[in-house]
Amino acid sequence: MKIIISGSTGFIGNNLSNYLADKGHNIIRLVRKTSKNISRNFETHLWDPDNHYLPDKPFIGSDAVIHLGGRKIISLRWTEKIKKEICYSRVNSTEILTKFISKMEKPPSKLIVASAGGFYGNTLDQKVDESDNVGTGFLAKTAEEWENSTFKFKLNKTSVIHTRFGLVLDKKEGAFPLISMPFKYGCLLYTSPSPRDGLLSRMASSA
């Protein structure tokens, strides 16, 4: 399959690109700028959603588009400016992709758009699934707007899939190095009522 991946130089995107390529798929990367985080020789195209620029060539004959783009949410401080960037970068880029695909004569059969488990808000130990309603808070609102941005344009030939990721952990990348830092200095104070002892144990042993 010919698969286009945006956000392909991020933590999840880079690992997913390599995994799918190892499975024999033809991976096309959409990147905002030339990145050093490209571990193998993938076909790469620049796009600029802020200026509504998306190249035609990589989409010709594509089977699926996976959209993972958006400002990193791992930050020491979520200022109002950063929160706006987190939301805008996801909603705007998704709208650009969806609009483009809606106008294609032969569009890809699948559009897979990242979302977040934060869609459900703070559920503590309550189990949720795709039938549950959106929660409250910044992440819930962002995830809702992000998913809704795919509904603004009619996609008759393309199935849309929203993937509500939970916390993805890796010892060297993503959120783990930051959230495991207190363990290294022996100063963690944990008071959450939600039972996450197994997660905490794994974090402590890996720190």
Residue spans for each PLM region:
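N-terminal Rossmann NAD(P)H-binding glycine-rich loop of SDR-like oxidoreductase domains
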Residues: 3-21
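N-terminal Rossmann-fold cofactor-binding loop
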Residues: 30-34
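NAD(P)H-binding glycine-rich loop region in Rossmannoid oxidoreductase-like domains
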Residues: 46-92
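Conserved catalytic-site loops of classical short-chain dehydrogenases/reductases
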Residues: 64-66, 109-113, 161
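Short-chain dehydrogenase/reductase
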Residues: 87-91, 132-147, 169
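Conserved Rossmann-fold NAD(P)-dependent oxidoreductase catalytic core, especially the SDR/UDP-sugar
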Residues: 95-137
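Conserved beta-loop-beta element that borders a ligand/cofactor-binding pocket
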Residues: 115, 148-171
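Single conserved hydrophobic/aromatic residue that forms the stacking wall/gate
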Residues: 190-207
